[in-house]
């Protein structure tokens, strides 16, 4: 905690539900006195950072089992950030931390169920015009483990039209442009961003 005192941290922003839960349970107030913890999606919403009407598209939203969004229903937060053209993709993705490695038999069955759900959602999105017949379906999430699991579906569905990504990465691409990541890395490397190794 003393290592970070000079920074006068007011808010810790996290992007992972498991990280959020761990920090909350690990004497957060002792480490960051007088500080609050908030999910990045809810933080962006507080700052009124969201996609404009022109930037909005149809998306599937995968709400992870360990959602970092704690202030309100995650679907409400996601719609506020990305627009109303969002369809929730129910069911666990099957990644579940280490489940895919420790119990691949169970994880595979969970993945098959999720794949069926994605196919249903894809059909509904195309039938209602949320996405075009040849457009990619983007499934967005807030969980690193889920992103890894959802990325596997692109190969499994064999139509090449499914992409998985983080909600904040999709927003960054639309708001900051396709070069946002190299620009961010360059700014960090040039000393424009405070880095702390604890």
PLM features: what roles do these ranges have?
Residues 1-198:
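Iron-sulfur cluster-binding electron-transfer modules in prokaryotic oxidoreductases
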């Amino acid at each position: 905690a003393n290592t970070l005192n000079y920074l006068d941290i007011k808010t810790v922003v996290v992007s992972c539900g498991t990280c959020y839960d761990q920090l909350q349970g690990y004497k957060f107030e002792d480490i960051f006195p007088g500080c609050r913890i908030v999910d990045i999606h809810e933080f962006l919403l507080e700052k009124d950072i969201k996609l404009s009407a022109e930037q909005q598209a149809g998306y599937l939203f995968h709400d992870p089992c360990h959602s970092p969004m704690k202030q309100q229903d995650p679907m409400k937060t996601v719609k506020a950030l990305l627009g109303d053209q969002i369809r929730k993709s129910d069911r666990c993705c099957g990644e579940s931390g280490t489940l895919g490695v420790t119990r691949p038999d169970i994880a595979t069955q969970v993945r098959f169920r999720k794949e069926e759900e994605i196919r249903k959602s894809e059909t509904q999105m195309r039938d209602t015009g949320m996405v075009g017949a040849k457009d990619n379906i983007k499934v967005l999430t807030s969980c690193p483990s889920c992103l890894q699991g959802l990325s596997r579906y692109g190969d499994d569905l064999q139509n090449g039209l499914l992409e998985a990504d983080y909600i904040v990465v999709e927003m960054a691409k639309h708001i900051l442009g396709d070069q946002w990541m190299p620009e961010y890395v360059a700014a960090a490397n040039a000393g424009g961003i405070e880095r702390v190794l604890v």
